């Protein structure tokens, strides 16, 4: 059963400027394994984190670093939740997040479906 759907878009150039202006933003938003990615990938991952939050009803207390986009070579990206995000997802009955990412023409897009088993 679908618990929630979230969609977000991020202007890559604007996101890059924000990160350049506020370097600590990377630490607040991304885990160690995410921070060294190119701006397009970071923007798409931030859109994914926003989409996860929306799929959960925009809960208070969600820590951005607790939502991680993981991708192994040759596989599609997946959402992993830890800490605050895991607690919120568990309380909502979410068993799996389905993720679609794209970036084109300077815009990064993410769609997330939160599903129970």
From Swiss-Prot:
<keyword id="KW-0443">Lipid metabolism</keyword>
<dbReference type="InterPro" id="IPR037143">
    <property type="entry name" value="4-PPantetheinyl_Trfase_dom_sf"/>
</dbReference>
<dbReference type="Pfam" id="PF01648">
    <property type="entry name" value="ACPS"/>
</dbReference>
<dbReference type="InterPro" id="IPR002582">
    <property type="entry name" value="ACPS"/>
</dbReference>
<comment type="similarity">
    <text>Belongs to the P-Pant transferase superfamily. AcpS family.</text>
</comment>
<dbReference type="GO" id="GO:0006633">
    <property type="term" value="P:fatty acid biosynthetic process"/>
</dbReference>
<keyword id="KW-0276">Fatty acid metabolism</keyword>
<feature type="binding site">
    <location>
        <position position="8"/>
    </location>
    <ligand>
        <name>Mg(2+)</name>
    </ligand>
</feature>
<dbReference type="GO" id="GO:0000287">
    <property type="term" value="F:magnesium ion binding"/>
</dbReference>
<keyword id="KW-0479">Metal-binding</keyword>
<keyword id="KW-0460">Magnesium</keyword>
<keyword id="KW-0444">Lipid biosynthesis</keyword>
<protein>
    <recommendedName>
        <fullName>Holo-[acyl-carrier-protein] synthase</fullName>
        <ecNumber>2.7.8.7</ecNumber>
    </recommendedName>
</protein>
<keyword id="KW-0808">Transferase</keyword>
<comment type="function">
    <text>Transfers the 4'-phosphopantetheine moiety from coenzyme A to a Ser of acyl-carrier-protein.</text>
</comment>
<dbReference type="InterPro" id="IPR004568">
    <property type="entry name" value="Ppantetheine-prot_Trfase_dom"/>
</dbReference>
<dbReference type="InterPro" id="IPR008278">
    <property type="entry name" value="4-PPantetheinyl_Trfase_dom"/>
</dbReference>
<dbReference type="GO" id="GO:0005737">
    <property type="term" value="C:cytoplasm"/>
</dbReference>
<keyword id="KW-0963">Cytoplasm</keyword>
<keyword id="KW-0275">Fatty acid biosynthesis</keyword>
<dbReference type="GO" id="GO:0008897">
    <property type="term" value="F:holo-[acyl-carrier-protein] synthase activity"/>
</dbReference>
<feature type="binding site">
    <location>
        <position position="50"/>
    </location>
    <ligand>
        <name>Mg(2+)</name>
    </ligand>
</feature>
